[in-house]
Amino acid sequence: MIRRPAVAGAFYERDPAALRRRIEWCFEHELGPGTLPAVGSMRRIKGVIAPHAGYMYSGPVAAHAYHELVSDGIPGTLVIICPNHTGMGSGVSLMQQGAWETPLGTVEIDSELAEAIVRESGIIDLDETAHLAEHSCEVHVPFIQYFTDNFRIVPVTMWMQGHETAADVGHAVASAIRETGRDAAVIASTDFTHYSPQDIAEATDRRIIDRITAMDDTGMYGVISELNATMCGYGPVAATIIASRILGATECDLLRYATSGDVTGDRSSVVGYAHLS
């Protein structure tokens, strides 16, 4: 099966040349890293947290994530863990077979790694339907395609985002990466506070990010509950923290935080975006 793009023409440009220009705009934007990265080969990064809104809003912050990832070396496989915004599919859904199409080309699914993740998990289902209309994995793929077509993906979407579920997903991903010997990194797809005034969003997100940089997934859940936070991808973030820790990561840094208000100038109701790795 080839999964067709669901949000081309909405979250990002449908025309390939225009999409490449938009990606360059994201990197060169004043809220972005300022330059396009050179492809490196160190391959130290185990996990990345990046936003998934429309490129005109969160693209510059996402560009920070991909500047660091590309500079470190593009992994052979990216396990992209995202929240389920549509309600379609099962509680945790993985697409195992086929490829994903974007305006920049087609990316194969790493079926062997996908199968290993499902085998290691007690909760992940093989389910294509959860991915068909979901934007929060799709928007990451063109950023890597801009630099290479030599990579594969494993898309995982989480409707169930409780801590036990995230722990299962994180352990399964890390165990499968080790079992298969893959050169892989994990991407957690999330936006932070939704539709609050800028000062409230920043204060709320700061508390959550403090726990993420400490790699304290338990504490992150506590803060989210305490503040009734509207972060949409807390389960993918927790799963990525857990997987990265198992794979040897010992630290996590905040590289960029901004809001939609920093782009549009309207700070009365914003969405928070962050890049951490």
UniProtKB/Swiss-Prot annotation:
| Gene3D superfamilies tied to this protein | LigB-like
Give the top-rank taxon of the lineage listed in the UniProt record for this protein: Archaea
Q: Which InterPro entries match?
A: MEMO1_fam (IPR002737)
Family the entry assigns: Belongs to the MEMO1 family.
The record's annotation in NCBIfam families points to:
AmmeMemoSam_B, PRK00782.1
Q: What is this protein called?
A: MEMO1 family protein MTH_45
